[in-house]
Amino acid sequence: MVYHHRGAYLMAMGTVASWALPMHPSYLYTVPMFHCNGWGHAWTMTLMAGTVICLRHFSPEKFFEQAGKHNITHFGGAPIIMNMLASAPDGIKPNFDHTVKAMTAGAPPPASVLEAMAKYGL
């Protein structure tokens, strides 16, 4: 895959528009940088003066730990990531005092996964 400046710009601007992204978001990476959202969201967060939090390895425990520590507002993840978060033990799931917005790509997550995530503010 070849990335180009025009594509990176369009991806960044499109994400700002489609996510109604505010200034200074706090974004938690759960996807590899070589994925479209992985590379594109680096530019998006820079555009919006955001904070980027990276995970070396994904696990629901690490996700929820870092999400709470850094007060994340946004994250991106494949449906399998969302399923892992929805299926995590209740004891590690925080109740966020704000909605954490997620962007996914590939096949849409099942409705049951989206419902489970919504219970915890995701």
What are the language-model segments listed below?
Residues 25, 31, 100:
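Nucleotide donor/acceptor-binding cores
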Residues 32, 78:
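Conserved proline-anchored active-site loop of SAM-dependent methyltransferases
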Residues 29-30, 54-55, 103-105:
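Thr-Gly-centered strand-to-loop micro-motif
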Residues 59, 80-82, 109:
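Alpha-helix capping/helix-boundary segments
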Residues 5, 9-26, 34-73, 88:
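Conserved AMP-binding/adenylation subdomain of ANL enzymes
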Residues 1:
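Conserved adenylation A10 loop of the ANL superfamily
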Residues 47, 69-77, 86-122:
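Gly/Ser/Thr-rich phosphate-binding loop
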Residues 11, 29, 41, 62-63, ...:
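Hydrophobic alpha-helical segments typical of transmembrane helices
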